[in-house]
């Protein structure tokens, strides 16, 4: 034993601040620090445990102490016969004894077996705890996988100082919050020996301001626990990341800090805690343990005003009123603030007062634009009171319903460190401001908050502009659909009966039913284009009112006796030339072949799109007709688009002109009706045929009298009872005929019922179809007998129509016998061809709609 003089250099006293609190917790430990130490002295009145020492006092005192220690040893062995702690002392190293008091209870908490302790703590040279194998059953009940709680080898945050950057790990019972196990790195990190933590409540070492946060974090984790059973054979390290939090843990004070308890400030070190819950199966049932891995935080700056080689960023989010809502845990080594300390504080207080003017402009642009790419360098305050320089990328979240700014998020890039590199030091009043500067800074902060709360954001303005534009587009669309209707004029009334939908497809009346949408170019994306049928119907009505039908009188006596298709009459050829443009671009081919007759082909070779310039006849097929219809639809849609491009004034002008034309046309029709009524009293040799299609253009060379076969006298037309072309019977000189009976009962009406929408008469019964020719559509014919009498009262030859086709003349001798007249209708798609026959020869014209 050495002298007492050297004992101060080789011994340390345990933390005196815990001398009283340790007595309560030590009583619950499975082992007692009151056990006699071999070769050591203890003092029960000092409040500290006895410390093994190499020095000794007089021989008398040592003998008395040995006797007392023997008595105490016997007492402890009777109280705790199952547990004994032996502490081996090394003279060259500082050995710390654990304070305790008498009367400790035994077997309250189980500790790990000595084998595992020696395996995981081989690097500890200070203290070795040995427990005799007196109760192997209880020791084997709890087996810890220490590989799960060993700290990492890298220090993720900041730079290591004098402490160990790897941190430490500990196991806590969730039953009473007592530390059951701690790694040996606890001593190098905080200065505490690991046995000082065992049996103590973990929350006693946590900073008072962080205890509520720690308790709430544990409670939240237990509400939805992530438990991995140790009895499972799977890897225990996967699929259980746990949760993290930042808190401050008390550091150990030794003799170097002095013996004064009241005048000494308690030091705390910030740690990043990672939680994991373990479910251990015991004899009493499942017990939940909490495994905590603590990694210390150190200041990220080493020198004053340090410029980091690698730019580091962290995120801060605050609300529109400046209240800080979130801060990254990665910001702790750079700012020094713990998230729970800075949350719910004014985020604008972090900015330097001299930079608030610039930040006011930044916030003004932020609420208008929605984001700011990257600001200039400005200053932000750290925990120690100094300022570091940062650059920030800003973004704002706008509530889509209220159009108000909800919160602002800033991603801050550190450019330069503060003047004091230790950001965890106590704050210093570095910046001293005058009252005027303080008032100005407060004014800037209030202005920034007012900007975030009151200024209307740009996304809201854009939304209003878009809504206004949509309303304008909708109004324009409605104006285009609902054009100004003409004023009601009694003379322009037109009674149109409901169309019989059995004669055409019902889908054609649907809006846009067969419209070529890909060919329709509309300014408004929401507008539904009109269908071709509707446009064609309107165009037919317009052409009906604007057209003046030109007719030719045919003298039956001038016809050769054997030429039913005599086409040399000049007035008839002129009327054929005045066929509407739709007829000129038809390109239809009709093949009419009778039994025992040569094939007769009628070709309308005027279509520029059908490639018929060679003059070769092409049969009327479905593909050619479909192609022709597509071209006509495109032309009609093009005309419709051109008319829509007119301004409102142009449309009004065109509407007025159309009404004026209708009035003039009606007047001419009425005048023509009066002329025809007067002419009925005089016998006439010629009569107008009714199976020719009217011309859409007025012929300059024809007299006015030939232009008034317009069915504008609606009362007269409604008295007609036929619906297909026929031959008129001229009035006799000896037997005059009234106006109501001057037409024969069999002729066909020359007005297209599909144009006027008039209901057609029921079709006549079909007698027999013609033989179907390859490449042709089936045709059906019905016999119609037309009797024509001359002025002498004897039957005369029928009145045949003349047609001029490629300057070819066909002649057929006329017989005195009465031949039946056949009407043939060919329809495909939107085209319809009507022919009348006498026998097997064609005797009629062509009708196209």
Curated annotation (Swiss-Prot):
GO cellular component terms listed in the entry, alphabetical order: cytoplasm; nucleus
Q: Where in this protein would one find the motif Nuclear localization signal, according to its record?
A: 63-74
Q: Where in the cell is it found?
A: Nucleus
- GO molecular function per UniProt: transcription cis-regulatory region binding; transcription corepressor binding
UniProt PTM = Phosphorylated with a circadian rhythmicity.
Q: Which UniProt keywords apply?
A: Biological rhythms, Nucleus, Phosphoprotein, Repeat
Please note every region of biased composition (Basic residues): 706-720
Q: Where is the PAS domain?
A: 166-296, 314-416
- Give the residue ranges for region: Disordered: 1-79, 680-746
Q: Where is the composition biased (Low complexity)?
A: 14-27, 35-58, 735-746
Assembly description: Forms a heterodimer with timeless (TIM); the complex then translocates into the nucleus.
The record's annotation in PANTHER family points to: PERIOD CIRCADIAN PROTEIN
Function, as annotated, reads:
Involved in the generation of biological rhythms. The biological cycle depends on the rhythmic formation and nuclear localization of the tim-per complex. Light induces the degradation of tim, which promotes elimination of per. Nuclear activity of the heterodimer coordinatively regulates per and tim transcription negative feedback loop. Behaves as a negative element in circadian transcriptional loop. Does not appear to bind DNA, suggesting indirect transcriptional inhibition. Expression exhibits prominent circadian variation in adult heads and in particular in the photoreceptor nuclei.
What's the protein name? Period circadian protein
């Amino acid at each position: 034993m050495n002298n007492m003089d050297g004992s101060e250099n080789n011994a340390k006293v345990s933390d005196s601040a815990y001398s009283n609190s340790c007595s309560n917790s030590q009583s619950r430990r499975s082992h007692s620090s009151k056990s006699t130490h071999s070769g050591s002295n203890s003092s029960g009145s000092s409040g500290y445990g006895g410390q093994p020492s190499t020095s000794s006092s007089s021989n008398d005192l040592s003998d008395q102490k040995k006797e007392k220690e023997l008595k105490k040893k016997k007492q402890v062995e009777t109280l705790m016969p199952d547990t004994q702690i032996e502490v081996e002392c090394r003279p060259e190293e500082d050995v710390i004894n654990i304070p305790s008091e008498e009367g400790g209870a035994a077997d309250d908490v189980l500790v790990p077996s000595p084998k595992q302790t020696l395996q995981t703590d081989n690097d500890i040279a200070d203290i070795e705890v040995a427990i005799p194998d007196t109760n192997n059953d209880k020791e084997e009940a709890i087996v810890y996988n220490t590989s799960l709680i060993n700290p990492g080898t890298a220090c993720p945050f900041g730079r290591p100082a004098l402490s160990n950057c790897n941190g430490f790990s500990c196991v806590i019972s969730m039953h009473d919050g007592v530390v059951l196990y701690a790694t040996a790195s606890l001593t190098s990190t905080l200065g505490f020996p690991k046995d000082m933590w065992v049996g103590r409540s973990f929350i006693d070492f946590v900073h008072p301001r962080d205890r509520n946060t720690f308790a709430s974090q544990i409670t939240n984790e237990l509400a939805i626990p992530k438990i991995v059973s140790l009895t499972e054979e799977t890897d225990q390290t996967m699929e259980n990341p746990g949760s993290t939090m930042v808190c401050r843990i008390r550091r150990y004070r030794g003799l170097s800090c002095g013996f004064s308890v009241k005048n000494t400030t308690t030091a705390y070190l910030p740690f990043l805690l990672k939680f994991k819950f373990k479910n251990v199966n015991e004899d009493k049932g499942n017990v939940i343990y909490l495994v905590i891995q603590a990694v210390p935080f150190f200041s990220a700056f080493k020198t004053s005003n340090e410029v980091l080689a690698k730019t580091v960023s962290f995120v801060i989010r605050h609300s529109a009123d400046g209240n800080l809502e979130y801060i990254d845990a990665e910001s702790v080594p750079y700012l020094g603030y713990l998230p729970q300390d800075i949350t719910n504080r004014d985020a604008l207080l972090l900015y330097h007062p001299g930079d608030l003017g610039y930040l006011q402009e930044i916030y003004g642009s932020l609420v208008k634009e929605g984001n700011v790419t990257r600001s200039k360098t400005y200053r932000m305050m750290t925990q120690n009171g100094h300022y570091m320089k940062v650059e920030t990328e800003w973004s704002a979240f706008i509530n889509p319903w209220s159009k108000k700014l909800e919160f602002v998020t800033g991603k801050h890039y550190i450019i330069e460190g503060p003047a004091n590199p230790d950001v965890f030091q106590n704050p210093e009043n570095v910046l001293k401001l005058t009252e005027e500067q303080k008032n100005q800074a407060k004014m800037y902060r209030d202005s920034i908050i007012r900007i975030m709360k009151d200024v209307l954001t740009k996304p809201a303005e854009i939304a209003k502009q878009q809504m206004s534009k949509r309303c304008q587009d909708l109004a324009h669309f409605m104006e285009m659909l609902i054009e100004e209707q003409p004023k009601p004029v009694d003379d322009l009334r037109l009674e149109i009966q409901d169309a019989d939908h059995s004669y055409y497809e019902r889908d054609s009346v649907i809006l846009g039913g067969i419209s070529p949408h890909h060919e329709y170019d509309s300014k408004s994306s929401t507008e539904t284009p009109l269908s071709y049928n509707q446009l064609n119907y309107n165009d037919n009505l317009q052409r009906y009112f604007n057209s003046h039908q030109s007719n030719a009188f045919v003298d039956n006596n001038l016809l050769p006796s054997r030429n039913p298709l005599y086409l040399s009459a000049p007035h008839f050829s002129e009327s054929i030339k005045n066929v509407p443009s739709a007829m000129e671009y038809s390109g239809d081919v009709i093949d009419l072949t009778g039994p025992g007759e040569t094939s007769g082909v009628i070709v309308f070779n005027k279509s520029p799109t059908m490639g018929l310039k060679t003059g070769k006849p092409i049969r009327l097929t479905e593909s050619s007709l479909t192609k022709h219809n597509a071209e006509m639809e495109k032309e009609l849609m093009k005309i419709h688009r051109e008319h829509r491009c007119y301004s409102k004034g142009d449309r009004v002008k065109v509407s007025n002109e159309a009404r004026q034309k209708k009035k003039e046309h009606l007047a001419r029709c009425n005048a023509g009706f009066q002329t025809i009524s007067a002419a009925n009293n005089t016998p006439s040799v010629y009569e107008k045929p009714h199976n020719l299609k009217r011309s859409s253009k007025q012929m300059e060379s024809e007299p006015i009298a030939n232009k008034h076969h317009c069915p504008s006298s609606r009362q007269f037309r409604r008295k007609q009872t036929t619906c297909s072309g026929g031959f008129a019977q001229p009035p006799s000189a000896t037997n005059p005929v009234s106006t109501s009976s001057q037409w024969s009962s069999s002729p066909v009406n020359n007005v297209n019922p599909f144009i006027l929408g008039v209901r057609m008469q029921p079709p006549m019964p079909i007698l027999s179809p013609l033989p179907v020719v390859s490449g042709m559509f089936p045709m059906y014919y019905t016999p119609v007998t037309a009797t024509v009498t001359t002025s002498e009262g004897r039957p005369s030859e029928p009145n045949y129509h003349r047609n001029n086709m490629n300057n070819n003349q066909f002649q057929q001798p006329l017989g005195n016998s009465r031949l039946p007249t056949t009407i043939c209708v060919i329809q495909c798609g939107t085209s319809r061809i009507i022919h009348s026959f006498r026998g097997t020869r064609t005797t009629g014209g062509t009708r196209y709609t």
